[in-house]
Amino acid sequence: AVYVASPYAAGYGYGYAYPYAAAAYRAAPVVGAYAAYPYGVATYPYYY
């Protein structure tokens, strides 16, 4: 799994994106968007 830095996540003290969400974005943007939605729509561009 690849951890992608995200301003949204960093703002909440995580400083990383959840690997399942990142993998979902790489496999299918629609699925990834659904998986990451609870963490903020602002993360969307960072997983492409």
Swiss-Prot record:
Task: Keywords in alphabetical order, please.
Answer: Cuticle
Which GO-annotated molecular functions does the record name?
structural constituent of cuticle
Q: What does this protein do?
A: Component of the cuticle of migratory locust which contains more than 100 different structural proteins.
Q: What is this protein called?
A: Cuticle protein 5.1
